[in-house]
């Protein structure tokens, strides 16, 4: 289920009978609508939500209004109901704990935030590995470590999100994009190129064109360090990648012209930003040389 597609269908005038019937999927659609700014859809979706999910939506609205007190009240209520004997829901409980972690981090309660997010990661993994919320929890755990300067631990969290599944393609792509930024900061540029390549193609597969353009431009910008027909093609480099041992030299930062040509041709008609055009002009010159 792609919540973006469902939101698009609702905006086109289709009725709520199109809402998915799986566990918590209407909640996912409602949150997508809020995230896209289509709050006018929420009144129609609300009858499809259970009591716990309704309080999560109230939490979302409180965040939109920068009302931290109401946000905490809504989460507390949702968490209490999710733990009740009558309406126990382990997956929603874990999701709420993740949200508590995010909220606590924003309030400066960093240690407790980490406890909440870690609990959510472990719980959702046990309940439904690869679920959308499992991926979100891992991404938030990585961000928590990154904000503490724990780059290795952040990368370890991203490594938990395998490109071979079971996580959603958009989760994998977001993870690889974030991992690339960490690797760039560590000056591990060829590893960053591999991650940007995976992110770019995953974003394309997920119809996230803006993110695909950004990742692709960044890949070209780094890759123009050296363009050589002796360089491994990126898919080969990805499949043959192995962890480096301590003391091993960093891989050469270079790309194959076939990969550059593919990326250039895909991007050329999809951006008119001056900075992007400059990068593409450099790519064109490299391909002509």
Q: What is each PLM-predicted segment?
A:
Residues 1-25, 216, 223-289:
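C-terminal non-catalytic interaction modules
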Residues 20, 49, 91, 132, ...:
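Residue signature of alpha-solenoid helical repeat architecture, marking inter-repeat boundaries
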Residues 24, 53-56, 93-95, 134-136, ...:
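Residue register of alpha-helical TPR repeats
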Residues 29, 58, 93, 100, ...:
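Structural register within alpha-helical repeat arrays
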Residues 33, 62, 97, 104, ...:
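Residue at a conserved register position within TPR or TPR-like alpha-solenoid repeats
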Residues 36, 65, 107, 148, ...:
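Structural motif corresponding to the intra-repeat A-B loop/turn of tetratricopeptide repeats
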Residues 43, 47, 76-84, 118-126, ...:
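Amphipathic alpha-helical segments of tetratricopeptide repeats
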